[in-house]
From Swiss-Prot:
Keywords: Chloroplast, Membrane, Photosynthesis, Photosystem II, Plastid, Thylakoid, Transmembrane, Transmembrane helix. GO terms for biological process: photosynthesis. The keyword Lipoprotein does not apply. PSII is composed of 1 copy each of membrane proteins PsbA, PsbB, PsbC, PsbD, PsbE, PsbF, PsbH, PsbI, PsbJ, PsbK, PsbL, PsbM, PsbT, PsbY, PsbZ, Psb30/Ycf12, at least 3 peripheral proteins of the oxygen-evolving complex and a large number of cofactors. It forms dimeric complexes. One of its GO terms (cellular component) is photosystem II reaction center. This is Photosystem II reaction center protein T. It comes from Salicornia europaea (Common glasswort).
Length: 35
C-alpha cells in the first residue's frame, strides 16, 4: 500500500512542476495541433 502512496505523491509532484513550467512559458504548443 505504501508503494501506491509514494507513486501518487510522485505523480502529483511531477504534475505540479509540469503545470508550473507550462504556465510560466508562453503557450506556443497550443498554436500547433498536438495529438
Amino acid at each position: 500500500m505504501e508503494a501506491l502512496v509514494y507513486t501518487f505523491l510522485l505523480v502529483s509532484t511531477l504534475g505540479i512542476i509540469f503545470f508550473a513550467i507550462f504556465f510560466r512559458e508562453p503557450p506556443k504548443i497550443q498554436t500547433k495541433k498536438m495529438k
